[in-house]
């Protein structure tokens, strides 16, 4: 592995990632929104805190490594992917905080089934928006710094790249399909007629799917789905090998955080259940984590040169 001088821009990306991680971690603890008079807070216990800190801790760790100048293209690849995915999420957050009352609907926020008849933003929402904005800015700077950062290897991952790209593309399609539907939903209710004993299944309104929301949320959902698929396809082609590791890690962290958030929501409330798409999101997240580990650990067999 050959690593040249780390440019200032690359270290600046590290600073932005560290700030984004710290702000995102802080955003998990105060009240997120007040929806219909109900205070919504992501963290109410230790398990909630562990789930909420998955992505911030990963971002913070990568940012510190990049700030110190260690394997810079790994950090730049992570920043580029995380920031690309943050654009759509930022638009969805802006809709949740300001536009969701235009068309009131049922939502599941932090395990709470609420109706967006009125929404008041709180510190958690503001900090979350700041963290996403910092992540987007880190991605922009990372794209500029990528070409100025010298980091090369012997091409050990090259024989595996086609298979890695194919597997990532398949998992990316699966991730988009799972992400399009709620990871935690309101189950149907069975009503029994006391006179006849006849059971009737009553469908309860649940949270809207990713592409069912209007305005900024719809645009954000489209951008998120497109960015997820694009990042899944491009990440294995990043060079050197550790650049691909950083890109795949960014996708894996996002998917695992989203899947665990859905599982947390279902565990916190008896009115909400974990869905098949939510379980699928966890599976594809683990799949990307496996690809990340494979790229990290891969060592191609070297053919000894003649006369060596």
Please describe what each predicted stretch is.
Residues 2-308:
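Compact integral membrane and secretory-pathway proteins
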């Amino acid at each position: 592995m050959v690593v040249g001088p780390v440019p200032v821009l690359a270290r600046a990306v590290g600073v932005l990632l560290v700030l984004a991680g710290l702000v995102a971690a802080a955003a998990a603890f105060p009240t997120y929104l007040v929806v219909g008079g109900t205070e919504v807070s992501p963290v109410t216990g230790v398990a909630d805190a562990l789930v909420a800190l998955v992505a911030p801790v990963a971002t913070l760790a990568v940012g510190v490594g990049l700030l110190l100048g260690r394997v810079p293209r790994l950090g730049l690849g992570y920043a580029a992917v995380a920031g690309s995915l943050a654009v759509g999420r930022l638009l969805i957050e802006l809709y949740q905080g300001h536009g969701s009352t235009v068309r009131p609907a049922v939502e599941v926020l932090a395990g709470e089934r609420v109706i967006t008849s009125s929404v008041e933003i709180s510190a958690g929402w503001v900090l979350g928006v700041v963290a996403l904005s910092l992540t987007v800015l880190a991605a922009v700077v990372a794209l500029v710094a990528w070409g100025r950062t010298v980091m090369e290897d012997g091409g050990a991952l090259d024989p595996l790249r086609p298979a890695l790209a194919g597997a990532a593309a398949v998992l990316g399609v699966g991730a988009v399909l799972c992400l399009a539907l709620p990871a935690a939903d309101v189950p149907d209710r069975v009503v029994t007629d006391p006179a006849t004993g006849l059971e009737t299944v009553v469908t309860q309104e649940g949270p809207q799917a990713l592409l069912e929301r209007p305005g900024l949320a719809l645009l954000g959902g489209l951008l998120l789905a497109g960015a997820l698929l694009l990042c899944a396809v491009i990440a294995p082609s990043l060079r050197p090998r550790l650049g691909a590791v950083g890109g795949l890690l960014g996708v894996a962290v996002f998917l695992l955080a989203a899947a665990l958030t859905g599982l947390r929501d279902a565990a916190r409330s008896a009115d909400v259940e974990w869905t098949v798409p939510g379980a699928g999101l966890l599976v594809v997240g683990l799949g990307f984590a496996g690809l990340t580990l494979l790229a990290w650990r891969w060592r191609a067999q070297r053919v000894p040169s003649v006369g060596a």
